[in-house]
Amino acid sequence: SVVKYQKKKYKIEDFALESIWQNDLKYEEYEKLNNFFWFFSLDLKSSKRTTQTVIDNWINKNHRYNKKSWDFDITSKRIISWLSNHQLTYEDCEEKFKKKFDQSIQKQTNHLLYEIKNLSEVENKIVGCAAIILTGLSYKEENKYLANGLTLLKKIIKSSIDNQGFPQSRNIKQLIF
């Protein structure tokens, strides 16, 4: 599943935030840190300002394309996490941060739109479509994201499901998502 439910909630203040982006991590840990899915484990009573500072620091460090941190799957999940946790990431933020956040989301979504055609894994394409569609729903004035995301999702469904509604692939990874 895209998001795993956890009962235990953490306060963002419990993490070592000053050194969070400077650690030399194994790829799996790096992926978990940079896709921000750990935000789903945060208590909604966590500091919004601290959460926004973590994002601001990430944007400052990764505003230019970097193959590792802009990996398609990582970027898709990061967009989903940032937008789904808007109570912590976006509410009550300063105008300067809001503008920077919006630009980063749009830049990352444009990257997904450009890269999705190069992917072969159906699961990653669907997660990418979810991120693009979520961006379109979150930024209604940018209706190109919603329209493009839905068009891509239709193409994925047409190419992976036959006329009777059965999966065309026998690949077990593509049958379970």
Stretch-by-stretch model annotation:
Residues 1-37:
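N-terminal transition regions in large eukaryotic proteins
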Residues 27-177:
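Aromatic-lined, polymer-binding surfaces characteristic
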